[in-house]
Amino acid sequence: MENVNIRVASPDDAEQLLKIYAPYVEKTAITFEYDVPTVHEFKKRIENTLERYPDLVAEVGDKIVGYAYTGSFVGRAAYDHSAETSIYIDEGCRNKGIGKRLYAAIEEISVAQNVINLYACIGYPEVEDEHLTMNSVNFHEHLGYKTVGRFEKCGRKFDTWYDMVWMEKMIGEHDEDVKMFVPFPELIL
């Protein structure tokens, strides 16, 4: 897709981002969330993410067509060089390279933050169904992620038990002389 602009999300984007996210909650097991958050709750999520991590949107013209962000992996200081990724693309804009562009930008920022390991927590169907396919796993594999763990039947949605896999991508070297994690706001000052 041409003319895609990637920029930092703002809490003011919450309503547009929620329009992208809501169908994932309502129709899929891609997220194990049951209830669509309010706009206020979504604004808070964006604000909380931006305190330490990037939250990016992809725009075509003035329409947001996707977003991706990273967040804390486990939430302890020893894990600062690891981050969890999330990505959501507008239903009508999938398979157009937007996700790949968003993740490329996320990886570039993560490297600048001295993040070395990226992780994705992905719903995994024993058998594909109308709510969950292998598309997310395949997308992440295409970008170099490897499956490193599988939790069986750990999430239940739409009266179905789903597995969850952790996928990992190393984007840096595990040197002894590791640099400190740099919070996202310090990169954009």
What do these predicted ranges mean?
Residues E2-V4, K63-Y67, Y162:
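Glycine-rich phosphate/pyrophosphate-binding loop shared by adenosine-nucleotide-utilizing enzymes
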Residues N5-L17:
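A short beta-loop-alpha structural element at the N-terminal edge
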Residues L18, A22-R45:
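Conserved GNAT-fold acetyl-CoA-binding loop/helix
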Residues P37-S82, S86-G92, I109, Q113, ...:
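Acetyl-CoA-dependent GNAT
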Residues I87-G92, K96, Y124-E126:
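Active-site acidic-Proline motif in GNAT/NAT acetyltransferases
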Residues N95-V111, M134-N138:
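Conserved acetyl-CoA-binding loop-helix of GNAT-fold acetyltransferases
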Residues S110-L132:
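Conserved GNAT acetyl-CoA-binding A-motif
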Residues C121-G123, V137, E141-T160, G172-E173, ...:
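Conserved catalytic-core motifs of GNAT/GCN5-like acyltransferases
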